[in-house]
Amino acid sequence: MLLLLSLVACGAEAQVRTRGIDVSKFQGTINWTKVAKDSTIRFVYIKATEGTSIQDPRYKANVAGARKAGLLVGSYHLYSSKTTAYQQFGNFKKMVKKKEQDLVPVLDIEGHHSGRLYMARVDKLLELMEAEYGVRPMIYTSERVYKTHFAGKKYAKYHFFIANYRRTPSVRYTLWQYTETGHVSGIRGYVDINRFHRKHSLSDIRMPRPKKKKSATEGEK
């Protein structure tokens, strides 16, 4: 019994200590080797695109550097209410290669969109991303936007990445962006830092492993 309790406690501690960051061009040139030396930093979400045509100039270097350092990598698209889902998906697809992704893609919907989100457009973009990458995207947003647009059963199967810098989110979430003024070795200035809800872990947002193709002789006796 004592051993079981010890294992449970160790698992809970490991989950609490698993953190991730999200970065863009605003973090400048990152020393990913130094970032990876922090044993609690296991993953990173990297900005790829925004709207129809904006592509983060540090994206490719950040993906390559983070992966080389041994961090799990995911990519995010900053949603714009001014252009179509197809245009935004085309921009994201050009930049984000499935084979370079360890984590599910993220659709970033900022708080200022709350009153004019155009939900049909959001739904279509989520649909296109899922078809391309083979997994439901995670949705990043604020509690206010979640309560206004995503609280219903329609989005119950999606993982949510919620920003709240004052307190633990009061809505359903998988990832919590708990600070925008974090400090991590290897990054000059502030960086967003994220951690999991106690019921979730990295396994919940990992990309599915590709299915192995059966050989011509497999199954033969």
State the predicted function of each range.
Residues 1-8:
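Bacterial N-terminal signal peptides
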Residues 15-30, 36, 46-126, 130-132:
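Substrate-binding cleft of extracellular glycoside hydrolase catalytic domains
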Residues 30-31, 148:
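Short acidic active-site motifs
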Residues 103-167:
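Catalytic domains of cell-wall/extracellular-matrix polysaccharide-remodeling enzymes
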Residues 16-23, 153-221:
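Functionally critical loop-and-helix segments that line ligand-binding/catalytic clefts
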